[in-house]
């Protein structure tokens, strides 16, 4: 923020109607501040021109005021405020009075600073994202397959009996985990039962027959 115009002006007091010299600063944001002197240590008053000022009078337009001794009426300047207060001023010269008039008038009617401040605030509100709590984070869905609840058909096995006849009977499988193991068909062949005593008798009989045959052969020779 910078100064738009600064300088000395005579200001008439509100009660005693005396003229007093003050230092005036007009800032770029539209604030007109006047001090006791140029050091700016003691502020007399301030006026926000875009908000407080409703009219600016110069020269013969000024009311209820007489210029200080030695000053023409064209050096007079009045700032009419919204609250009914009127600040009566007198410039060093007519040209200085016109320069102050035009500068103050531009500051009063120029709402670029106020408008930009309001616009930036609205833009910031519009551009700001909503609270994160407004949008809940979606819960991720997990898809899986449960264990197989069905049962595989029972396998079969073929069993041959001693007489050579085949039989198909279901085969029972042990537990094979969650998914189980597919059954398979198996063939089991059982050899026919042989009697050990019968085999021994047949062997002895065969041996005796062989011995008799050999004995007869030797007897002939």
Swiss-Prot record:
**GO terms of molecular function:** phosphatidylinositol-3,4,5-trisphosphate binding
> Which Cys residues form disulphide pairs?
none
Q: What does this gene product do?
A: Involved in retrograde transport of recycling endosomes.
Query: In the UniProt record, does the keyword Membrane occur?
Result: yes
- State the SUPFAM superfamilies in the record: PH domain-like
Tissue expression pattern = Highly expressed in brain, retina, heart and kidney. Detected at lower levels in lung, muscle and nerve.
Q: Where does a 1,2-diacyl-sn-glycero-3-phospho-L-serine bind?
A: 20
Q: Which SMART domains match?
A: PH
Protein known as:
Pleckstrin homology domain-containing family B member 2
Keyword field contains Transport: no
Q: What is known of its domains?
A: The PH domain specifically binds phosphatidylserine, which is enriched in recycling endosome membranes, it doesn't recognize PIPs.
Which is one Gene Ontology cellular component term of this protein? recycling endosome membrane
Q: Which Pfam families match?
A: PH (PF00169)
Specify the superkingdom. Eukaryota
Q: How does it sit in the membrane?
A: Peripheral membrane protein
Tell me where in or outside the cell this protein is found: Recycling endosome membrane
Check the record and name the Gene3D superfamilies matching this protein: Pleckstrin-homology domain (PH domain)/Phosphotyrosine-binding domain (PTB)
List the source organism: Mus musculus (Mouse)
List residues of the PH domain.
2-109
This protein's UniProt keywords: Endosome, Membrane
Query: Where is it chiefly localized?
Result: membrane
């Amino acid at each position: 923020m910078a100064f738009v115009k600064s300088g000395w002006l005579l200001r008439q007091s509100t009660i005693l109607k005396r003229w007093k010299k003050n230092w005036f600063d007009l800032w770029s944001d539209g604030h007109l501040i006047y001090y006791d002197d140029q050091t700016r240590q003691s502020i007399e008053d301030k006026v926000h021109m875009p908000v407080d000022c409703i009219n600016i009078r110069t020269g013969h337009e000024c009311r209820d005021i007489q210029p200080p001794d030695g000053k023409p009426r064209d050096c007079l300047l009045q700032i009419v405020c919204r609250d009914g207060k009127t600040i009566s001023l007198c410039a060093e010269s007519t040209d200085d009075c016109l320069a102050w008039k035009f500068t103050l008038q531009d500051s009063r009617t120029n709402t670029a600073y106020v408008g930009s401040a309001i616009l930036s605030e609205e833009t910031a509100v519009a551009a700001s994202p909503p609270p994160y709590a407004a949008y809940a984070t979606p819960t991720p869905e997990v898809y899986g397959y449960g264990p197989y609840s069905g049962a595989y058909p029972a396998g079969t096995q073929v069993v041959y009996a001693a007489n050579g006849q085949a039989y198909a009977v279901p085969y029972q499988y042990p537990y094979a985990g969650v998914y189980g193991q597919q059954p398979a068909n198996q063939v089991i062949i059982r050899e026919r039962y042989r009697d050990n005593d019968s085999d021994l008798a047949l062997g002895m009989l065969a041996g005796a027959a062989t011995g008799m045959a050999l004995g007869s052969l030797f007897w002939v020779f």
